[in-house]
């Protein structure tokens, strides 16, 4: 049995999922990402309306999770989200004449990576969980085909077919910024976690080894590392950042190595 790892946590491969074995597209996707059919698996992958979706089988009323860079909330933010004035843009050092090359080391569903790409950054996404990586790949496929955003998406946004920053460091050209948004356990007192996040956390779990991400991120980035954290979370790995950019519910801890030029 193969395994993929980032820091200490190891995800054993292949990953069990439920899917229609008579659907060639699904069979191909699952084979590519080492996902194997299991009649008792808690999650199902479906391919409907040219879109790969993930479903939690014991909560059939929940909508499927998919990656969509073309419509919905991400499209609205791209058009009306504040451009380079956004906190995330300031955190990665976007400014006039400076458009950094970014590695998103915890890509998830790709939303922050998409924001940065839409603002001009070249973004390489790293996602260690194969199911999430499959969703990302499908979202990119549809975005690349879109008449409005396809051209610049193909130029600026890609998925690294590997599971760790260490693996990426062996292949990647110079990286200006590494961006990290580790999954953080929600407070029991917090408002109901969004349905999507609940499904996502059940699949992936909290990044209990997140502290181990900082060192390889610092080794890979030439300019800075940016860590997105809930406002109540401690510093990653207990290391004090060079500066902090605060938002309503989160903050961006910035670890500066050299000036952005």
Curated annotation (Swiss-Prot):
It catalyses: guanosine(1516) in 16S rRNA + S-adenosyl-L-methionine = N(2)-methylguanosine(1516) in 16S rRNA + S-adenosyl-L-homocysteine + H(+). Its EC number is 2.1.1.242. It is found in: Cytoplasm. S-adenosyl-L-methionine binds at residues 111-112, 127-128, 163-164, 181. Specifically methylates the guanosine in position 1516 of 16S rRNA. Belongs to the methyltransferase superfamily. RsmJ family. This is Ribosomal RNA small subunit methyltransferase J. It comes from Shewanella sp. (strain MR-4).
